[in-house]
Amino acid sequence: GKTPRIIEMWPGLYEKGLFGLAIDLGSTTIAAHLTDLKSGDVLKSAGVMNPQIRFGEDLMSRVSYSMMNVGGDKEMTTVVREAINSLAKQLIIDAEIEKNALVEVVFVCNPVMHHLLLGIDPVELGQAPFALASSNAMTVRTSELDLTEMNPSGMCYILPCIAGHVGADAAAVALSEEPNKSNDLVLVVDVGTNAEILLGCLLYTSPSPRDSCA
């Protein structure tokens, strides 16, 4: 197994609970659920518009912005991390918990949002073969993503992307709903700025970017 890590130390017997965030980092909206890590209960939920929208309303516009502006990817990384911090701060205040008790974050997102969250230039996703810099699941410290409104030694778990424009959000739906285990033919559609379609019993998936529907 993995080597245990100390995330935080409290004096005496600590009974105030430990908490996590489940975040869907979408192209248009960032949605977050604050959860009790012991019970799994969702305590508070909130959402905010993704501030990257000022760089482009859809994913390919943002990739184009990165291509045409030196440091454009870093600008988009900075503003989205700031928005996540603001969202976390709001939830902490609403739930009346201490910042250091927020020790885990799970992110799901499409590949462009995935790259920009991690500080990876998404330019390769703007042209065939739409190569991902990494499609692996990742575990990093919150401090590595400049997430300051939670425990600095806390952990971020980023689910794996599936392919070029099929991201961790689709992977999360597949894990949760398990359409491939149904005896019926199941169609799951994520209707978003970057829509995704999953089809089972066997599992097939495909991106459906908004631009292709215009």
Each model region followed by its residue ranges:
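Conserved small/polar residues in nucleotide/adenosyl-binding loops
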Residues: Y204-D211
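Short beta-strand scaffold segments in enzyme catalytic cores
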Residues: I30-L34, A195-G200
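Glycine-rich phosphate-binding loop and adjoining helix at the ATP-binding site
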Residues: D58, L116-A172
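N-terminal glycine/serine-rich phosphate-binding loop of ATP-dependent small-molecule kinases
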Residues: G1-L116, V123-Q127, Y157, A168
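Residue-level signal for well-ordered, solvent-exposed loop/turn and beta-edge residues enriched
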Residues: S39-D41, E196, L203
